[in-house]
Amino acid sequence: MFTVFLLVVLATTVVSFTSDRASDDRNTNDKASRLLSHVVRGCCGSYPNAACHPCSCKDRPSYCGQGR
């Protein structure tokens, strides 16, 4: 009976540990998405010499050759 108890405790610990790591990965992906969105927004005309595609900014049509 004690062996069954130890197996249940071990199984619970393993499941808890793996689900915690999975949620950490999701949080990392969310943070990366937010950082990338700030980079794209930052180079939409605010920095003329930025190394990004100017047409990624929807509200500045002159950067895409439409307003010239």
From Swiss-Prot:
Residues 17-41 form a propeptide. Keywords: Acetylcholine receptor inhibiting toxin, Amidation, Disulfide bond, Hydroxylation, Ion channel impairing toxin, Neurotoxin, Postsynaptic neurotoxin, Secreted, Signal, Toxin. Disulfide bonds join C43-C57, C44-C52, C55-C64. It is found in: Secreted. Residues 1-16 form the signal peptide. GO terms for molecular function: acetylcholine receptor inhibitor activity; ion channel regulator activity; toxin activity. Transmembrane segments: none annotated. InterPro entries: Conotoxin_a-typ, Toxin_14. Expressed by the venom duct. The modification 4-hydroxyproline is found at P48, P54, P61. Pfam families: Toxin_14, Toxin_8. GO terms for cellular component: extracellular region; host cell postsynaptic membrane. The modification Glutamine amide is found at Q66. The keyword Secreted applies. It comes from the Eukaryota. Alpha-conotoxins act on postsynaptic membranes, they bind to the nicotinic acetylcholine receptors (nAChR) and thus inhibit them. This toxin has higher affinity for the adult subtype (alpha-1-beta-1-gamma-delta (CHRNA1-CHRNB1-CHRNG-CHRND) subunits) (IC(50)=2.3 nM) of the receptor than for the fetal subtype (alpha-1-beta-1-epsilon-delta (CHRNA1-CHRNB1-CHRND-CHRNE) subunits) (IC(50)=22 nM). Belongs to the conotoxin A superfamily. The cysteine framework is IV (CC-C-C-C-C). This is Alpha-conotoxin PIVA. It comes from Conus purpurascens (Purple cone).
